[in-house]
């Protein structure tokens, strides 16, 4: 009996034929995969089978999209991503048209018979699973509950999309993130005791957010507006809609991330610094100039007034774009900005390659603590480590 492929167990070692996606004339089939959590896994399978993957839609390329994407189904030009999985599972190249989205459901087609079986003259039909519809097992349920318990940042996380997309990407199960979310909300939420699991915990940062939400009910997430989402939106629109609906939560998480990044080692709490995203166009003052022109407490308080709404909106827009570009969550992108002094170019390079473009290291909590010390030797060590310009930028960033 054909079982669902477990792509998570051995993603680097597919066993299907290396010519699976090579035509009879020796040319490789070309595929374009719409951005999704499954894109990397699909690309691995395609490349191992001798196919090629396009960065953009090219003439002659097979356009792949996940079932349920409204734009893809409306155009009629896309083939279900299930085509790749079924080809690999059977280790044979199947009929493309049987998986075309729009005119006929790929899921329904997959449930009738594998297209390709007739082409090969197979006389013995196999029991087939519904494409994209795999029954949930007890192991799947435990995996879902455990993942929520360990990764849910707040009660509202389970009604959003980011948590479930991350779980799908982790390949703990073979279900889509929409199915995982639906399974938890309709069947598993509140049933942890049946699986000998405790209630889903909330991280310390989330507990702070929850307390603030209780004090300010208008800023709290009710969860009800998220029911307005439709599963037909492509992933890019999911991310935009989720952040628009939770704008207040995004602002609070930025503040929380800042506080977590900077460990206070004195009794009195210094004022938190906001995230200011800069393009690094103007030259900041040198550390020497900065030490000679320290603003008094009243000036600092004036500078630390609330950021204007347009500035908040611009910051959220930039962070959202980086989340989509690198397929990362809000916390990861925010921490990257904090470690790179809010510099957009440096943060983008760090997210792409794991290091700054100028070759200098990123800032740590200990570095920030050292930066506050009135010690010439310590300051010189920081200048040697990060460069005078980066030290000056860090000082300016912390002032904001």
UniProtKB/Swiss-Prot annotation:
SUPFAM superfamilies: Homeodomain-like. Signal peptide: none annotated. A motif (Nuclear localization signal) lies at residues 384-400. The keyword Cytoplasm applies. Residues 280-305 have a biased composition (Acidic residues). Residues 128-188 form the Myb-like domain. Residues 105-126, 196-244, 264-311 are annotated as: Disordered. GO terms for molecular function: telomeric DNA binding. Residues 112-125 have a biased composition (Low complexity). One of its GO terms (biological process) is positive regulation of NF-kappaB transcription factor activity. Acts both as a regulator of telomere function and as a transcription regulator. Involved in the regulation of telomere length and protection as a component of the shelterin complex (telosome). In contrast to other components of the shelterin complex, it is dispensible for telomere capping and does not participate in the protection of telomeres against non-homologous end-joining (NHEJ)-mediated repair. Instead, it is required to negatively regulate telomere recombination and is essential for repressing homology-directed repair (HDR), which can affect telomere length. This is Telomeric repeat-binding factor 2-interacting protein 1. It comes from Macaca fascicularis (Crab-eating macaque).
């Amino acid at each position: 009996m054909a079982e669902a492929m477990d792509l998570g167990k051995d993603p680097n070692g597919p066993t299907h034929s290396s010519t699976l996606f090579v035509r009879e004339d020796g040319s490789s089939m070309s595929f374009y995969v719409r951005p999704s959590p499954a894109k990397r896994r699909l690309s691995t399978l395609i490349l191992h089978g001798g196919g090629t993957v396009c960065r953009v839609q090219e003439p002659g390329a097979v356009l792949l999209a996940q079932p349920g994407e409204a734009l893809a189904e409306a155009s009629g030009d896309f083939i279900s991503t299930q085509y790749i999985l079924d080809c690999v599972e059977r280790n044979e190249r199947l009929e493309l048209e049987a998986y075309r989205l729009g005119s006929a459901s790929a899921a329904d087609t997959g449930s009738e018979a594998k297209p390709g079986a007739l082409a090969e003259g197979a006389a013995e039909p196999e029991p087939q699973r519904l494409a994209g519809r795999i029954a949930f097992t007890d192991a799947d349920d435990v995996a879902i509950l455990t993942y929520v318990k360990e990764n849910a940042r707040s009660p509202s996380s389970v009604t959003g999309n980011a948590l479930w997309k991350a779980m799908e990407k982790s390949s703990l199960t073979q279900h889509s993130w929409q199915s995982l979310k639906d399974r938890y909300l309709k069947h598993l939420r509140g049933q942890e005791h049946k699986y000998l699991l405790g209630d889903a915990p909330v991280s310390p940062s989330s507990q702070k957010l929850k307390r603030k939400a209780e004090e300010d009910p208008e800023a709290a997430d009710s969860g009800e507006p998220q029911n307005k989402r439709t599963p037909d939106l492509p992933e890019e629109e999911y991310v935009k809609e989720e952040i628009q609906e939770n704008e207040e939560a995004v602002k609070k998480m930025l503040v929380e991330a800042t506080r977590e990044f900077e460990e206070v080692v004195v009794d009195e709490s210094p004022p938190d610094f906001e995230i200011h995203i800069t393009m690094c166009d103007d030259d900041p003052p040198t550390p020497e100039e900065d030490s000679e022109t320290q603003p008094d407490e009243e000036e600092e308080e004036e500078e630390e007034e609330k950021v204007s709404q347009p500035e908040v909106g611009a910051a959220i827009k930039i962070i959202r774009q980086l989340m989509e570009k690198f397929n990362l969550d809000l916390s990861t992108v925010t921490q990257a900005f904090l470690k790179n002094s809010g510099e957009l170019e440096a943060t983008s390079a760090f997210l792409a390659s794991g290091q700054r473009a100028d070759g200098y290291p990123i800032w740590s909590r200990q570095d920030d603590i050292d930066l506050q010390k009135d010690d010439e030797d310590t300051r010189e060590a920081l200048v040697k480590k990060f460069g005078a310009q980066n030290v000056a930028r860090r000082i300016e960033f912390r002032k904001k």
